[in-house]
């Protein structure tokens, strides 16, 4: 009997994919992944150590993560009557939504450039992907969006608010129009809410087809891999059927519950990031030949000639940013830098300034 080859078994669209690439970052100033650069204070680290030591890791975690859900609902101001579903990061939640909605010929609609996982997971789920370009300034082309919704009748619309990789908030009235005319679900991804201050989570009761997604990764808990989805129980009760058992491990549940009881610590760190974002933006704006785009997130998108070469030179100097050049026509010659600590930002700024002067 002849052994089957991968191309005989695996779907062609999966064979055509490239695996998501995470560049090596050992011993680098890591400014590429929108992580919170600050560690937790010593008193919290000590409490976490005690929690880990006392945890029965030989037992499965609470399958419903009830204690964690309770503190998250309160801390994040989830409206009464709404429920939350937890995921092993937001990526799992995105995948659950798409798997649930992937009827034959079902379509996912989003904007471009946007979060790369929307398109990738649409392929996983075998959904048709529709990407609507933003305007050159990365604002929402609302007329084009509304026309696309009318034409394609998407089952699900995903919109990041603020957007990644551009960092800007879309016009609220435009998003309201999209939610109102959509024939299916609209999922607002608020991964960067701590740095933006605006949210649709308080509007969940206003729109029966609205879901709001959050993550704790950008707040400072990226290593725990915890995302959440807030919305009406009639939606979440069905999505829960696709959530794998025990998807949020016991350490994540207990540690996140403890940290969320000290949410003010994370808020103070987010405040510090917003302040250093302003200083970083001002520095970049004063460099010759750089176009800096407005940001309501914990990163800044900027454009300069020879971006890919600058990216490689920064790497050689031990600094890792995100190279977006050639990833989308609107991102030609664009790099994205995460807001780091003041020391990390200074090293990046001084190195970038020297590289530009050397060119």
UniProtKB/Swiss-Prot annotation:
Q: Give the reactions, separated by semicolons, that this protein catalyses.
A: L-histidinol phosphate + 2-oxoglutarate = 3-(imidazol-4-yl)-2-oxopropyl phosphate + L-glutamate
**Protein's UniProt keywords contain Kinase:** no
Q: Which UniProt keywords apply?
A: Amino-acid biosynthesis, Aminotransferase, Histidine biosynthesis, Pyridoxal phosphate, Transferase
Supply one GO BP term: L-histidine biosynthetic process
- Pfam families reported in the protein's UniProt record: Aminotran_1_2
Its annotated pathway?
Answer: Amino-acid biosynthesis; L-histidine biosynthesis; L-histidine from 5-phospho-alpha-D-ribose 1-diphosphate: step 7/9
Signal sequence span is: none
Superkingdom of source: Bacteria
Mention one GO molecular function.
histidinol-phosphate transaminase activity
Q: Name the InterPro entries for this protein.
A: Aminotransferase_I/II_large, HisP_aminotrans, PyrdxlP-dep_Trfase, PyrdxlP-dep_Trfase_major, PyrdxlP-dep_Trfase_small
Identify which top EC class this enzyme belongs to. Answer: transferase
According to the record's subunit comment, the protein's assembly and interactions are: Homodimer.
Q: Which family does it belong to?
A: Belongs to the class-II pyridoxal-phosphate-dependent aminotransferase family. Histidinol-phosphate aminotransferase subfamily.
Q: Protein name, please?
A: Histidinol-phosphate aminotransferase 1
Its taxonomic path starts at: Bacteria, Pseudomonadati, Pseudomonadota, Betaproteobacteria, Nitrosomonadales
Gene (UniProt):
hisC1
């Amino acid at each position: 009997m002849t052994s089957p080859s991968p191309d005989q078994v695996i779907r062609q669209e999966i064979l055509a994919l490239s695996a998501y690439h995470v560049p090596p970052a050992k011993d680098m100033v890591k400014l590429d992944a929108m992580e919170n650069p600050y560690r937790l204070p010593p008193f919290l680290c000590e409490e976490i150590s005690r929690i880990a030591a006392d945890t029965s890791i030989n037992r499965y975690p609470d399958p419903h993560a009830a204690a964690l859900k309770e503190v998250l609902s309160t801390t994040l101001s989830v409206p009464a009557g709404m429920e939350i579903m937890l995921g092993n990061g937001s990526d799992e939640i995105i995948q659950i939504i798409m798997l649930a909605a992937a009827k034959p010929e079902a379509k996912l609609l989003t904007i471009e450039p946007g979060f790369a996982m929307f398109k990738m997971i649409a392929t996983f789920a075998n959904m048709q992907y529709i990407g609507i370009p933003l305007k050159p300034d990365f604002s929402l082309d609302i007329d084009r969006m509304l026309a696309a919704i009318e034409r394609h009748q998407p089952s699900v619309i995903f919109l990041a608010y603020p957007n990644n990789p551009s960092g800007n908030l879309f016009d609220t009235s435009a998003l309201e129009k999209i939610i109102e005319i959509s024939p299916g679900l609209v999922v607002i991804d608020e991964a960067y809410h701590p740095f933006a201050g605006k949210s649709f989570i308080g509007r969940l009761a206003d729109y029966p087809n609205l879901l709001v997604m959050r993550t704790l990764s950008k707040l400072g808990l990226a290593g725990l891999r915890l995302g959440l989805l807030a919305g009406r129980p009639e939606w979440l009760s069905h999505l829960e059927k696709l959530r794998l058992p025990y998807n949020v491990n016991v350490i994540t549940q207990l540690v996140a519950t403890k940290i969320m009881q000290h949410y003010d610590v994370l808020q103070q760190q987010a405040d510090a990031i917003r302040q250093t974002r302003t200083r970083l933006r001002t520095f970049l704006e004063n460099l010759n030949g750089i176009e800096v785009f407005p940001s309501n997130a914990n990163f800044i998108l900027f454009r300069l000639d020879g971006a890919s070469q600058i990216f490689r030179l920064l790497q050689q100097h031990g600094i890792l940013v995100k190279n977006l050049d050639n990833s989308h026509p609107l991102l030609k010659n664009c790099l994205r830098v995460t807001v780091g600590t003041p020391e990390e930002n200074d090293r990046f700024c001084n190195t970038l300034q020297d590289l530009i002067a050397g060119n």
